């Protein structure tokens, strides 16, 4: 969505408007505003929510600020994410704080009272890092810099502190699998076969390796290998040609990515959505997805986070069937959360057919998970209309019937005891 600096894209809505990109000040609603699936409400600092009297009965006692450098406002609660309401935000399309035509951290901080009024528990930020934006920011050119359209590191720090003061946590997308071809690591890696960072990426003289790995973007890529004329070799990429995969068999890469996590967690982030984690490793004779080595590295990431940054969360983005995704919980020692992609289309199927069978079927096929883990459910997010996890027949049905009536989602609500994720501006 293109931001109009003359429009208020983040103010509190009129009573009947659920969208996160609307205008107006929050009037006292006629009745209590309750978000389905809400966790116990957070203490409100600065001003009272319109529905505060209703939420007060479920609110824990006043939370004490933990005396650390991040200035957090939460008691220790390692399972906070299990009932939290997450709200996805694309910075560019949310609110323009400096009048340059692009949403930014200044604008997001300005609208925190609106987000607090909605009753959310955690903001999930889409990619905010320095990037040439060939793939919406999922092509990162500097893991420790903010895209200049969105602001500065100081702006991020100020926003996180302001969110924490309102009892709102913040997580962000982190792409671990690959970088932009503009990243200095890759620029150095491709400069010479003798480069110190040559082994930071997956290079080969033979483009027939890993032939059993599927091509994800078949409409734009004909191979998972691209030829680099600089050194006369092929580099591996599971996504676009301008997103070379990091080589996690190289210990220096593992250390570098752990350093990236520490950088942002030290800044105050409450966790990450780990993008494209099924593809971290490659092995001949496999489809190069969901490999044991990927799980071992994620366990190392989790152990690092638990030891150094308690109460943070790792959310796995693995667009796979539940039997495969459940592996990303490990024994409660890998990711805290994972998306349940197959539920989303079946929710809409059930509403259109006016029967619960599609939802019940996929839930029956969903394995149990450790007690300290949680599925993340969503009706829509930036991966909306993701119909990979349905049959051909179901896909044809969804193409013809998908969300004709927007009231369907209001009828369903979010009634499972799972962590709901909302997306600003997508519920009109």
Regions of interest found by a model, annotated:
Residues 2-9, 14-19, 23-38, 42-428:
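Active-site and adjacent substrate-binding regions of carbohydrate-active enzymes
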